[in-house]
């Protein structure tokens, strides 16, 4: 079981109240909800845009003796959040390829249209996706994993 209520079992999706069908796991792909190439469609939480060049410069500033300014720090926090578990989900391969670096609104709509995985339900209810959302979802996924696989007792 990977849902607390038992509505979704590994390898199956509940289509109707009594009917289960096999889920084609080979058709799923791992998606970075906030994409690795985020600068084009994902402004910082203060609403300002970032260029790819500015993101690269922030990574270099990390090692400068004068340290980071607030903007560079925000850029680096975003860069560090992107590969985290809370930012990853499963989507149909074709959906992932068509959306790649799209804004959250487009990705959320695609989840509504093409996903019935319990894993994506919380994402479909959100209006925004940022570093705080990534951290919160990561903690929730870790808590769920510990309930499913509690380890040795």
Predicted regions and their residues:
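Long, cytosolic, alpha-helical-rich C-terminal regions that act as interaction/scaffolding modules
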Residues: 73-153
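Short beta-strand-alpha-helix junction that forms the catalytic/metal-binding core
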Residues: 28, 41-96
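Aromatic-lined ligand-binding clefts that engage carbohydrates, nucleic acids, or primary amines
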Residues: 1-56, 74
């Amino acid at each position: 079981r990977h849902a607390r209520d038992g509505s979704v079992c590994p390898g199956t999706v509940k289509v109707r109240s009594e009917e289960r069908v096999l889920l084609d796991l080979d058709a799923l792909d791992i998606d970075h909800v906030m994409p690795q190439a985020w600068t084009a469609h994902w402004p910082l939480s203060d609403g300002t845009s970032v260029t790819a060049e500015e993101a690269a410069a922030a990574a270099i500033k990390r090692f400068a003796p004068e340290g980071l300014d607030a903007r560079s720090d925000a850029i680096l926090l975003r860069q560090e959040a992107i590969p985290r578990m809370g930012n990853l989900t499963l989507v149909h391969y074709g959906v992932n390829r068509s959306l790649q670096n799209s804004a959250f609104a487009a990705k959320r709509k695609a989840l509504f249209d093409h996903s019935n995985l319990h894993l994506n339900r919380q994402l479909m209810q959100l209006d925004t996706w940022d570093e705080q959302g990534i951290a919160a979802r990561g903690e929730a996924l870790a808590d769920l994993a510990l309930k499913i696989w509690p380890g040795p007792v």
